Curated annotation (Swiss-Prot):
Keywords per UniProt: Phosphoprotein
Record field: compositional bias (Polar residues): 626-651
Transmembrane domains' residue ranges: none
Record's keyword annotation contains Phosphoprotein: yes
Cited function: Required for normal transcription at a number of loci in yeast.
Encoding gene per record: SPT21
An annotated GO cellular component: nucleus
InterPro entries: Spt21/Ams2 (IPR042403)
Low complexity bias spans: 395-408
Protein name, entry field: Protein SPT21
Length: 758
């Protein structure tokens, strides 16, 4: 048998299969529950049968408590979001407590609101609860499908409340002690179900719309909700309507009023393109564009290509400047650069250029080099032709020099003809220059104008050719005097015989050569021409002798200074010296004869005006010539000042003796010269050693030719001694001989140095 009792509700429910956890809702006021005792379905160890106390309550009361405790979990506008909940409860009367479905939450709400005849007010809560209980119990009997069963258990929280209430009674407070000791425990599960408004029929849409109309159509008194839950319901409804972004017109046939249209307060974003190409591929046409010519897709394609081209043209790229220290920044050239050769660097200059223009006549005069035509009939010769002619004349002169002395007369004629030709050539040049004195003034004016032009056209130097130096402008022309009379006879004998012979005719002030210096110093110190001077500039600091004594004797007889070691500064020069010395021998005879004749005539002329002191000097010179014929004959030439005193007979006789002595000596030498020259040539050809070698410095194995006086003295002292002849070959023979012997015979550098001192 069942009975009615008052107890509180304890509701345990889960959402989405328990993924979000379990929830608990308690009722604040006790509810009327029908309680019954049934046998327990769970078997026990003992055969004794136990009873189970259960309670039954209506589903509407349970949902109301859930809405009051957690309104955010179960929303009334779930259908607008496109989903719904299916409601299950656990039946404790069956074994294992299975879940029993009660239907969709939206359908249950519809039934509860239609069949609720009671009203809810805040003033008479107790009365309404009593009436509610009575009405619920009546409905439970009418419809048992919405009855939910649960287990009746003890209320632990009620025991705590009783202890708290007893303490409060002792303190004088009045507390309601009507708290039930038991509670009803009900277990529910809400499972989400996805719904679609478009696919559903008219009935479902109407039912859902009516469900949405529930808050507006029904008065607030008819709803079993509190004002707090009602306000929360309105806020959630507005929120979901914004998210759904749908407008629903509600037509109420009973009232005849039209609902307001809901709009989105947020503005919609602007469309970038109004038309778009299809995603599928069309067949290409003849133009291979992929779209028909008159179609909208083709127009869109062309518009897209046009916009892409404009975007590429409008893209501005920043200019990258790269400036180096050695290079100007030419990214933006404000000045135009001239490409000509002479003005390719003018853009680097900051100064302004002069804008003066030169007349073309003056420019042509400045550009043309001055030239003088010697022969007006003949065209001017080029430099190549002039060089060739000069070479031919030089070759002819050299060939004439290399001939023997027998052909000297013919060579002299040829040389004179060549020199006369050259003199005629020079005279023609001088006559042309001197005959036109007015032309020189014009040329000076042209030079001044050319200088002005060169100043105005500094920047155009490369385009103007350099002016050639004329014969008048040459510096050597001012120094040389062409009108002076040259001694062409002496010039022909000296210049055209050998290449280096003309050095002796020049003064040492002009050319300070080793040969000229050595010649002057030999005359001052009365040294042998074979001895080399101490000249650090030519690396000759030790005096050396010639290779042979016979060469020295011939040199003294011919009065020619043979090339010494001063000229032999390299192996190449030393090898070429014997060939040069061969040419000297052929040309020395004529010069020696000429010099002797000139010396004799000068002495004869001077002897008439000489003083007694001069006569003594001449006697000494004659004795020297008689004693030693190998000394140079240049000492016979005496240059004295003319005197007005009358000449004596002694001077005349002395001069006659000198001339007779010279003629006899010259006649003897003329026969011996030919043989001596041939021997010298053969000795020089055989000689292969370098003159500066020890073999040439010290004649170790060659017997030395001593003078006749020394040989006679040695024979007088040592008549039977044969070993004395070997002393001449000794290297240190200079140390044994003393006095005059050492001064006459020099076999080593030390002995030569001692002879110079004596």
């Amino acid at each position: 048998m069942s009975e009615l009792s008052q107890m509180t509700l304890k509701i345990l429910y889960t959402l989405d299969n328990g993924s979000n956890g379990s929830y608990l809702a308690r009722s604040r006021a006790p509810k009327q529950v029908r309680v019954a005792n049934i046998p327990s379905p769970f078997p026990t160890d003992s055969n004794e049968q136990t009873e189970l106390r259960i309670g039954a309550i209506h589903l509407k009361t349970i949902l109301h408590e859930i809405y009051l405790n957690s309104p955010e979990v179960l929303d009334h506008d779930t259908l607008k979001d496109g989903y719904d909940y299916n409601l299950y409860y656990r039946d404790i009367c069956e074994v294992d407590e299975p879940l029993v479905s009660l239907g969709l939450l939206s359908g249950l709400r519809k039934k509860f609101h239609k069949n609720s005849p009671y009203q809810y007010t805040e003033n008479n809560i107790g009365e309404e609860e009593s009436e509610e209980r009575d009405e619920v119990t009546e409905e439970e009997y009418e419809d048992e499908s919405f009855i939910v069963t649960g287990r009746v258990c003890s209320n632990v929280s009620a025991l705590l409340r009783r202890s708290y209430s007893n303490i409060s009674n002792k303190k004088g407070r009045v507390v309601n002690n009507q708290i039930p000791e038991e509670t009803l425990e009900v277990k529910l599960r809400f499972t989400k179900v996805i719904t679609n408004l478009r696919t559903s029929g008219n009935n479902t849409t109407n039912s859902r719309i009516s469900c949405l109309q529930m808050p507006s159509s029904l008065p607030s008194a008819t709803l079993p909700f509190t004002p707090k839950s009602q306000s929360l319901f309105k806020t959630n409804q507005i929120k979901n309507s914004r998210n759904a972004r749908t407008t629903i017109t509600i037509n109420n046939t009973n009232s005849g009023t039209v609902g307001r249209r809901q709009t989105n307060p947020m503005p919609a974003p602007k469309a970038v393109r109004t038309q778009s190409l299809p995603i599928w591929n069309l067949k290409p046409n003849i133009a291979n564009t992929g779209f028909p010519r008159n179609s909208i897709a083709h127009k869109i394609y062309l518009a897209d290509r046009k916009t892409e081209a404009n975007q590429q043209n409008n893209q501005h790229q920043n200019i990258a400047y790269e400036i180096n220290t050695l290079q100007n920044d030419n990214t933006i050239q404000r000045t135009k650069i001239d490409d000509s050769v002479s003005k390719r660097f003018d853009f680097m200059l900051n100064k302004r250029k002069s804008t003066k223009k030169v007349s073309p006549g003056i420019a042509t005069i400045a550009k043309k080099p001055a030239s003088i035509n010697i022969n007006p009939k003949q065209p001017p010769k080029t430099s190549g032709e002039k060089k060739a002619n000069d070479k031919q004349t030089i070759v002819k002169v050299k060939n004439s020099n290399s001939k023997n002395s027998a052909k000297s007369t013919q060579a002299g004629c040829r040389r004179s003809s060549v020199i006369e030709h050259l003199n005629d050539h020079d005279d023609s040049i001088l006559s042309d220059i001197l005959s036109e004195p007015g032309i020189e003034g014009q040329k000076l004016q042209q030079k001044q104008k050319g200088r002005k032009i060169s100043l105005t056209s500094e920047n155009d130097k490369e385009n103007i050719p350099p002016q050639s130096i004329t014969s008048k402008e040459n510096k050597l022309e001012g120094d040389l005097d062409f009108n002076a009379e040259f001694p062409m006879s002496d010039f022909s004998d000296v210049v055209f015989k050998d290449e280096m012979g003309w050095f002796s005719n020049f003064n040492c002030n002009f050319f300070e050569s080793p040969t000229s210096a050595s010649a002057s110093q030999l005359n001052q110190q009365n040294l042998k021409p074979s001895i080399t001077l101490n000249d650090p500039n030519t690396c000759n600091t030790i005096a050396l002798e010639n290779e042979d004594v016979s060469e020295l004797e011939t040199a003294q007889n011919n009065k020619i200074s043979l090339p010494s070691d001063v000229d032999k500064t390299s192996p190449i020069d030393s090898l070429s010296i014997p060939l040069i010395e061969l040419t000297h021998s052929s040309s020395t005879t004529n010069m020696q004869r000429i010099s002797i004749k000139e010396g004799s005539t000068l002495n004869i002329t001077d002897s008439n005006n000489a003083t007694p002191c001069d006569n003594d000097i001449k006697d000494r010179k004659a004795s020297v010539i008689d004693s030693d014929n190998t000394k140079p004959q240049a000492g016979l030439i005496n240059f004295s000042t003319p005197a007005d005193q009358p000449a004596s007979d002694n001077n005349v006789t002395a001069s006659k003796k000198l001339t007779s002595m010279l003629e006899t000596q010259q006649s003897k030498r003329s026969h011996e010269e030919v043989l001596d020259e041939e021997e010298e040539e053969e000795a020089l050809k055989k000689q292969k050693a370098i003159p500066s070698s020890p073999c040439g410095m010290f004649n170790y194995h060659q017997p030395m030719e001593l003078s006749e006086d020394i040989v006679e003295e040695e024979q007088g002292h040592n008549i039977g001694d044969d070993n004395e002849s070997d002393k001449t070959n000794d290297l240190f023979s200079t140390f044994i001989h003393s006095g005059i012997r050492v001064s006459q015979v020099v076999t080593s550098p030390i002995g030569e140095f001692q002879s110079i001192k004596h």
